[in-house]
Amino acid sequence: MKSFLDSNFLLQSETAQKLYHEHAAKMPIIDYHCHFIPHPIADNYQFADLPEIWLRGDHYKWRAMRANGVPETYITGDKPAYEKFEKWAESLQYAMRNPLYHWTHLELSRIFGIDKVLNPSTAREIYDECTAKLQTPEFRAQAIMERMNVEVVCTTDDPIDDLKYHTQIRQSSLKTKVLPAWRPDKAMAIENVDTYNEYLTKLEAAADMSILNFKNLIDALQKRHDFFASQGCRLSDHGILTFYAEPYTDAEIEAIFLKARMKKELTVEEIDKFRSAMLYEFAVMDAKSDWVQQFHYGATRNNNVRMFKQLGPDTGYDAIGDAEVAAPLARFLSRLDEEGVLAKSIFYNLNPRDNELLMTTIYSFNDGTVPGKMQYGSGWWFLDQIHGMEKQMNALSDLGLLSRFVGMLTDSRSFLSYPRHEYFRRILCNILGREVEDGLLPASELSFIGKMVEDISYNNAKGYFKF
């Protein structure tokens, strides 16, 4: 019987072990998409206890705790820190086979040096040991990043953000590069005209100009885009239900925008036309700046209306959607390609039914200018687990070039999430190692396969994003 989480965890062949230990393990981390708040990094924040660094804002854990019958007061409520942690430890034991079980123990082992299994009987001991370590300089925010060999982190930032904390980080002694990434979702969220107009007021202030018409809107966003570029931004990110590619005229978009400015309710058709125009304009900006654009699509948000009213967004009530994607995605990319403004792009689907659909569509738009120009992104969110990542890499291998893949990202809000890169690398090495052992890949090419592992773990991302 193998030991849990030993040095060969997930590595089920000698070749897999060789690939991981000799090639993957040593590579630095490029975390090109996450949801870290830059303020704690800038301040080199010292976390008070495990719930603050581990449970706060982690809707993965919150969903599991709710499913285990834990009352909300222990999750997002005001119960004492240890009582919240105790409920998490109780729930974790029931979460076997959920990726949370592996992630939790990897984080305890790699960051805190604790190899005990977390359960109700060990909860107090682990809590006390981790909390004591969190009070030391080695566990401040910046120290954790450096200790985990993190070379680059890209945060997720709204166009109105002043990026002052990124400036503060650059001026610090932190070796890790912390760069902004452009996330302009609110600039196209015209479906709620009251909220949208409130946002435009903030955008006017950030861009130092009035926004009276659609051209003003694009000019204001371009000013902010240029500012982000001056601060080292190399990526954009867009959270969308599907790809908006409805036909429209400039006159229609102007009329829709002015109608929204007058706070008149828009039709579904008008909303989709406006979204289509905005998604196109964002893509043009990215292409002209030689950025990489990312598209996370397919989530239905805030499904539980009662809890959304109580807790707000990003609290564990989102799900996999089933919107049509094939035709609008092809229209969207084809227009950009015809106009010569199709930037390097990464696509993340939330519905696994789309794996092959997405791969075959985006690979219709590789143009020979850049290796791996159109990227099929790593398994995202609900697919960020062994089977989801294997399916993503299998679809990428079956229909494209796994060797050109830019690899893993945490997509996380937690400073303890970096072992997910290790998790991914072990899964990658296990896939390749198994196929060498089974004679599906030549053992004589093991040197190249080792280089391939290093590329997917680090080199491809470094070159693709020009970090």
Regions found by a protein language model. Give the residues of each.
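Short, basic/hydrophobic alpha-helical segments
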Residues: 332-338
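A short acidic, glycine-rich active-site loop
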Residues: 267-268, 317-323
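Hard-cation-handling environments
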Residues: 299, 304
